């Protein structure tokens, strides 16, 4: 998602960041507000190709049986991050344990321990998904992070989180197939060419 940082006016007692974030969500319907590394970011509503790519991505996850008794496939579910006292992210897509609703932390966000995979489809600010969120999700020990980079026509699969990074970072181009780790709960391979084509930004 494309994101812009939000500046805070100077005052003696600034409101908590979660309060600011929730106020912005109320003022900007359809926008995605997150706190990553102690910085509030606001992403505008996605364009059509972004939404198309996300739906196309969901199909193989559902076909693999990942939306069942053991795991669920969910869009825009809040993930509470350990990187800051009020940090959270809202990935475009996630595979979570089926009992995720028993692990609510705060502000409609859930314990990162229930997340088996998170996935982002980039918009204008692709660097956030490939930099800041890499650190955030790795620190949260999310086992698999997938990024569809629409700008460069690539699919990134990051695994083996260690500290603030992932030890394994595979990049796939059209014509290749990306095999995801079975730890997500099923054997699953993504057709990179199809995803790049449906997600291609229209200029």
What spans do the regions from the language model cover?
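Gly/Pro/Ser/Thr-rich low-complexity, intrinsically disordered segments predominantly at protein N-termini
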Residues: 1-203
């Amino acid at each position: 998602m494309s994101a812009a940082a939000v500046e805070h006016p100077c005052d003696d007692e600034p409101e908590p960041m979660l309060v600011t974030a929730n106020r912005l969500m109320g003022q900007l319907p359809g926008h995605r507000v997150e706190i990553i590394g102690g910085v509030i970011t606001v992403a505008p509503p996605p364009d059509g190709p972004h939404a198309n790519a996300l739906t196309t991505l969901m199909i193989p996850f559902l076909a693999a049986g990942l939306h069942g008794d053991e795991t669920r496939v969910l869009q825009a579910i809040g993930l509470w991050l350990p990187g800051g006292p009020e940090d959270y992210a809202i990935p475009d897509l996630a595979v979570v344990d089926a009992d995720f609703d028993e692990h609510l932390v705060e502000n409609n966000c859930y314990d990162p321990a229930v997340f088996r995979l998170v996935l982002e489809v980039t918009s204008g600010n692709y660097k956030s998904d490939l930099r800041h969120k890499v650190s955030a999700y790795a620190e949260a020990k999310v086992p698999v992070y997938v990024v569809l980079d629409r700008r460069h026509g690539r699919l990134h699969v990051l695994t083996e989180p260690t500290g603030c990074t992932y030890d394994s970072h595979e990049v796939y181009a059209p014509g290749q197939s990306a095999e995801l780790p079975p730890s997500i709960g099923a054997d699953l391979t993504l057709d990179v060419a199809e995803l790049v084509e449906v997600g291609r930004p229209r200029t």
